[in-house]
Amino acid sequence: MRLSRYFLPILREVPKEADIVSHRLMLRAGMIRQESAGIYAWLPLGLRVLNKICNIIREEQNRTGAVELLMPTIQSADLWRESGRYDDYGKEMLRIKDRHERDMLFGPTNEEMITEIVRGSIKSYKSLPLNLYHIQWKFRDEVRPRFGVYRSREFLMKDAYSFDLDAEGAKHSYNKMFVAYLRTFARMGLKAIPMVADTGPIGGNLSHEFIILASTGESEVFCHGDYLEMAPPPADVNFDDAAAIQQVVNDWTTLYAATEEKHDAATFAAIPAERQMAARGIEVGHIFYFGTKYSAPFNAKVLGPDGAEHLIHMGSYGIGPSRLVAAMIEASHDDAGIIWPDAVAPFQVGILNLKVGDSAVDAACADLYAKLTAAGVDVLYDDTDERAGSKFATADLIGLPWQILVGPKSLADGKVELKRRVDGSRELVTPAEAFERLKG
């Protein structure tokens, strides 16, 4: 993409309404614009990051055997009355009436709807286990939305729902999502630690939050320091091998890790002092097993192998992609701007033409741009007339992981400058070497 043809409304001044780093940088980088309190338009740069996050989530969900569908944002209030949760959300739930005076609502979550869908379609244990997921916008009318997309009223959510004949099968489904989440966050360049968590209004008796450590985190968390050195599950993990999946879960839950609500000071104190970690954390995922909490009021049953009816055992598994964008920025930035993990950066490579109009520089940039694009690399080519300092600032602000600086002085020696955003390192290489390094 040529920057001269792209929509990138950069803000050079720090927005006064932004209280935290991610909100400031997302506004300055032209990723989002606020349309009303807690509601944001995702501009092209922000949408590219959001889509890359969603693609990784999809790939890892599909790897487990989960099946994607899409449920509506508007739900019938009758479903929520049937589950008994219609009043639980209070004013957080935005309630509306259609032209026929029927009570409707903007869905804050989808346990009721997915249970109703499965109730009407699954009658036998032979159709289980089943895991259905979707990625959809949700709305919760927060009293005080703040911090940009980190805590907004409208947000994008991946929620998955598992259905099993019994508690044993449901535990395996839970474990599969546990492992999938470890892989998902690792692929995004994040070290997410699973922590025993409170179930809240979702309900159930088993829950883990996946937390990334950040000084700006909203809550205090406590864990063993060895978690930071643990390797994620491999790509070839067999999700059908219940024993192998259970072993991964055991490895990641044996050491102490808990959110503030579930913290046990005595257990934490037993950890060697040099391995104790008390820090701020950001929740990036949350999984629940809640048994028959929803299948019971909906009478969602299947015939078992014994010929008797059995209530379906369920779990739910959430990741907020829009919130995750902000969390990544909170965890990885510097004074110049965003430092994206390579896998989710809006563009992998930036080509900076430092003297537009110079025939040799223009030709070298055009050649690199054509070759890298043909190789499938996401490239942003800054072909604008801005001064060099402004181009450097923009590339660092939006977090381009690799930057190729093409100017007449270095090009006269047959070289371009290759810069790595994460550490600021630079080296002179030939254009051909730059291409070989970055072609993937």
Swiss-Prot record:
CDD domains: ProRS_anticodon_short, ProRS_core_prok
Sorted UniProt keywords: Aminoacyl-tRNA synthetase, ATP-binding, Cytoplasm, Ligase, Nucleotide-binding, Protein biosynthesis
Principal place of residence: cytoplasm
Keyword field contains Nucleotide-binding: yes
Annotated InterPro entries: aa-tRNA-synt_IIb, aa-tRNA-synth_II, aa-tRNA-synth_II/BPL/LPL, Anticodon-bd, Anticodon-bd_dom_sf, Pro-tRNA-ligase_IIa, Pro-tRNA-synth_IIa_bac-type, Pro-tRNA_synthetase
GO CC annotations on file: cytosol
UniProt-listed HAMAP family: Pro_tRNA_synth_type2 (MF_01570)
Quaternary assembly: Homodimer.
Descriptive protein name: Proline--tRNA ligase
Encoding gene (name): proS
